[in-house]
Amino acid sequence: MSPKRDGLGTGDGLHSQVLQEQVSTGDNLHECDSQGPSKHTLVREGKTYKCKECGSVFNKNSLLVRHQQIHTGVKPYECQECGKAFPEKVDFVRHVRIHTGEKPCKCVECGKVFNRRSHLLCHHQIHTGEKPYECSECGRTFSYHSVFIQHRMTHTGEKLFGCKECGKSFYYNSSLTRHMKIHTREKPYKCSECGKTFTYHSVFFRHSMTHTAGKPYECKECGKGFYYSYSLTRHTRSHTGEKPYECLEHRKAFGYHSAFAQQSKIHSGGKNL
């Protein structure tokens, strides 16, 4: 899997070179309007380059030129597995891990691996006990931003991300992105055993178990097996009695989010949270 090499083309490359030479003269402010295919506008302010389209600031001209691909629609990095293209190399590399299964980010505390550094940093809060996200409504704190957002919606019932195709709305942008695959018919997950493709990773993972006939997560108390670690965690509460979801109206606690959500729905007058 490798990026396309045609990139911005010779016209933009020459323009970038000229811009760098002009900036090196020491001008504090440099504006450049290109009439080429990219139609970009670059601004040099002090030691930074600012994009006139969105206001993003960069310390290198090369970074700004690369950023401009977002606005021009240029996507030089193409996945050879599924044909999906990306304007940024970092997004391309991250996408490729879907096909390769690579998870280069490892937790030094427990050995769990992740395909993104941001996921590792988020996971590490489990070990540190850090809860940086505080609800302004009730004061409850959370380790994960996603959980914090989900909790906040129990107060507002707001779903910010709407699908332009069917009108369905979601709490998270990631949920909307996942949903959009229904309309685009994208199936980025391919089984290496039989070649079957899937829209969602969860379905792909369950399918892969039909080849291995395994449920890797087993309860030490009763021996029941699960496909996912979070399913085992949820099941374990039936043995430990842990109830992490608390209704602030009645100070009632729940072991499962579904039960907590049902209780919250009662308080909200029957609205879906």
UniProtKB/Swiss-Prot annotation:
Gene Ontology, cellular component aspect: nucleus
Name of one Pfam family that matches: zf-C2H2
Zinc finger (C2H2-type): 49-71, 77-99, 103-127, 133-155, 161-183, 189-211, 217-239
Compartmental location: Nucleus
SMART domains hit by this protein: ZnF_C2H2 (SM00355)
Xref: InterPro entries: C2H2-ZF_Transcription_Reg, Znf_C2H2_sf, Znf_C2H2_type
Protein family: Belongs to the krueppel C2H2-type zinc-finger protein family.
Protein task: May be involved in transcriptional regulation.
Protein name: Zinc finger protein 80
Upper lineage: Eukaryota, Metazoa, Chordata, Craniata, Vertebrata
Encoding gene, per UniProt annotation: ZNF80
